Amino acid sequence: MRLTYIFHSGFAIETDRCILIFDYWMDPEGIVPQLLKTEKPVYVFSSHFHEDHFNREIFSWRQTRSDIIYILSKDILKHRRVQKEEADVWLAKGGTWSDGLIRVAATGSNDSGVSWIVETDGRRIFHAGDLNNWYARFLTDDYRGGLVYSAEFGIDVNPEKEEKRFLGELKDIRKITDSFSVVMFPVDGRIGNGYTRGARQFIDTFQVGLLVPMHFVASGFESAWRMKEFTDAKNIPFWCISREGDSIEF
């Protein structure tokens, strides 16, 4: 299988029999038009309504490939970003779908929408969407509990409670499986100290064949690479993405 980094949290996976595209936002290197030239079935996933994970441009691809299957989180419909008939499959946490070629399970998120488990060609793939321990930077030695103000998000949060929600989602996912061939997971230095904590907790919970960082822009590549010291300690391969359009075989 070939995994290609498109941008931010957007990826394409090409197998011997199909193409999977996750959380498309932008395509600086023009990856998608080349993929749409194939005769393989194409499946497009969007994990939630945030603009950095969902772009209505995906529906314009039907002009090139009328047979694309769109698999979207139900929260996108709830936020009126699309009409129901525009997507083929709508899933919320706990929902599943299969067509014989791929099997999809929508797992939870402690933010918006869902995360995805996709099984195809003997591989189990995980895309986290916005599942992450987003407020880990507040869990310092001097934190005494309760609410703290997050200037980035403009809200008061309880980081201890948020971490429990995140770990609860991991527990629910583990009820389905304890291992993945490849995992795409947020490692976003913009959220401050502790930005690797969620990914570290994930690899402590699951067997991972390859960990792939996401949820950053060009300025965040090197900060994402810091996660490699933690994957190396557990003998987990880590992909140090260096630019949009990078690919790796796994």
Language-model-detected regions and their locations in the chain:
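Active-site neighborhood of phospho(di)ester-bond hydrolases with catalytic His/Asp-centered motifs
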Residues: 21-25, 40-54, 70-75, 126-130, ...
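A short, compositionally biased micro-patch
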Residues: 6-8, 16, 109, 119
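Binuclear metal-ion centers of metallo-dependent hydrolases, dominated by the metallo-beta-lactamase
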Residues: 1-8, 81-97, 191, 195-250
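Structured loop/turn residues at beta-strand edges in well-structured enzyme cores
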Residues: 39, 102, 178, 206
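Active-site HxH/HxHxD metal-binding segment of metal-dependent hydrolases
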Residues: 33-97
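Metallo-beta-lactamase
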Residues: 70-125, 144, 237-249
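Active-site environment of divalent metal-dependent phosphoester hydrolases
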Residues: 27-30, 49-54, 77-80, 95-97, ...
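Pre-active-site segment of Zn-dependent metallo-hydrolases
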Residues: 10-61, 131-176
